[in-house]
UniProtKB/Swiss-Prot annotation:
GO terms for biological process: steroid metabolic process. The active site is at 12 (proton donor), 36 (proton acceptor). It catalyses: a 3-oxo-Delta(5)-steroid = a 3-oxo-Delta(4)-steroid. This is Steroid Delta-isomerase. One of its GO terms (molecular function) is steroid Delta-isomerase activity. Its EC number is 5.3.3.1. It comes from the Bacteria. It is an enzyme of class 5 (isomerase). The keyword Lipid metabolism applies. InterPro entries: NTF2-like_dom_sf (IPR032710), SnoaL-like (IPR037401). Homodimer. Keywords: Isomerase, Lipid metabolism, Steroid metabolism.
Length: 123
């Protein structure tokens, strides 16, 4: 199961880098939850999750997996996400914790990061 979970994490990072909210949301189960960052309002359901990722539409985004641990339908992983937005570049290295169903869809995602973790530089 851990190989399948690691593959699902890779698909998620590829989808985030692709910048398509619909493609990202398709990786989630219909009744999945998302908390990004931890402490923010809980986002529930695929449609709401697609809306959440709407900020990425058309943005130039890259991702890099830094570490992943996967076991029994769960994954904890750190990664770097770089977003070029006009004249500024945003870089953050969150730690995401996800759970997956038997079909490999994300059932929950919690992202551990705070605004102070984001580095903003001129592009």
């Amino acid at each position: 199961m851990s190989a399948e979970v690691k593959a699902a994490v890779a698909r998620y990072l590829d989808a985030v880098a692709g910048g398509s909210p619909a493609a990202i949301a398709a990786l989630y189960a219909p009744d999945a939850t998302l908390e990004d960052p931890v402490g923010a309002d809980l986002v529930r359901g695929r449609a709401a999750i697609e809306e959440f990722y709407g900020a990425l539409a058309g943005a130039k985004v890259s991702t890099e997996l830094l570490a992943v641990r996967a076991v029994a339908g769960h994954a904890a992983f750190s990664f770097r996400v770089t977003t070029d937005a006009g004249d500024q570049q945003y870089v953050v290295e969150p730690i995401d914790v996800m759970t997956f169903d038997a079909d490999g869809q994300i059932t929950s995602m919690r992202a551990f990061w705070a605004p102070g973790d984001m580095v903003v530089t001129p592009a």
